[in-house]
C-alpha cells in the first residue's frame, strides 16, 4: 500500500492516476468529520470562484442596480451553506442505494467517497469556469455550444470519478452494481427536482 501524498494537490494528482487507489488511501487515512466538512467548504468556495463568469452574466441580465451584489451573495450562501448540506444528503442517498445492491460500505465511507470525489473533480469545475469566462467573447451559438460541452464534460467526469471511487468503497466487484446504483441515484434526484416547486 502506498502512503498518502503530502499536500492536497499531490493527493488529487495521485487520485487522478488511480481513482480506486486514491479513495483506498483516503479511507485508510480515516479523515475526521471536520476534515470532510473542510473539503466541502473548499469545494464550494472553488466552485463559487469558477462560477464568477456566469454570475457576472446573470447579474448583467437582471439590469438592476446592485444586481451583482445580490447574485454574488446568493451564490456564496449556496456554496458555503447549501452545498455542504447537499453533499451530506447525497452521501446518505448513495449509501442507502448502494446497500440495496449489496454494497459493504458505511455512511462514513460514503461521505469520504463523495467528498473526496468532489475534491478530485475540482480541476474539471475550474476548467469549466475558465471556458465560461471565454464564452462571452464568442459568437452566441458557438459560445452556447462550447459552454454546454464544457458543462457536460465536467458533469460526466465527476460521475466517472464518483462511480469509480464508490465501486472501491462499497467493495463492488461487478460494474453492473455501480451502474445500477448511479442510475437509481440519478432517477431519484430527477424525481425530487420535479417535485420541488419552482
Predicted segments, located by residue:
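Hydrophobic alpha-helical transmembrane segments and adjacent short intramembrane/lumenal linkers
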Residues: 77, 91-198
Amino acid at each position: 500500500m502506498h502512503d498518502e501524498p503530502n499536500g492536497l494537490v499531490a493527493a488529487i494528482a495521485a487520485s487522478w492516476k488511480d481513482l480506486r487507489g486514491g479513495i483506498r488511501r483516503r479511507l485508510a487515512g480515516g479523515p475526521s468529520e471536520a476534515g470532510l466538512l473542510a473539503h466541502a467548504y473548499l469545494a464550494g468556495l472553488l466552485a463559487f470562484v469558477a462560477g464568477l463568469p456566469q454570475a457576472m452574466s446573470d447579474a448583467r441580465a437582471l439590469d438592476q442596480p446592485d444586481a451583482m451584489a445580490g447574485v454574488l451573495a446568493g451564490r456564496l450562501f449556496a456554496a458555503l451553506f447549501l452545498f455542504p448540506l447537499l453533499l451530506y444528503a447525497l452521501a446518505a442517498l448513495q449509501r442507502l442505494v448502494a446497500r440495496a445492491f449489496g454494497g459493504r460500505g458505511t455512511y462514513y465511507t460514503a461521505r469520504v467517497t463523495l467528498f473526496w470525489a468532489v475534491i478530485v473533480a475540482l480541476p474539471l469545475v475550474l476548467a469549466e469556469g475558465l471556458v465560461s469566462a471565454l464564452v462571452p467573447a464568442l459568437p452566441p451559438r458557438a459560445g452556447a455550444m462550447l459552454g454546454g460541452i464544457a458543462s457536460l464534460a465536467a458533469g460526466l467526469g465527476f460521475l466517472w470519478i464518483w462511480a469509480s471511487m464508490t465501486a472501491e468503497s462499497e467493495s463492488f466487484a461487478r460494474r453492473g452494481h455501480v451502474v445500477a446504483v448511479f442510475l437509481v441515484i440519478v432517477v431519484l434526484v430527477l424525481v425530487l427536482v420535479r417535485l420541488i416547486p419552482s
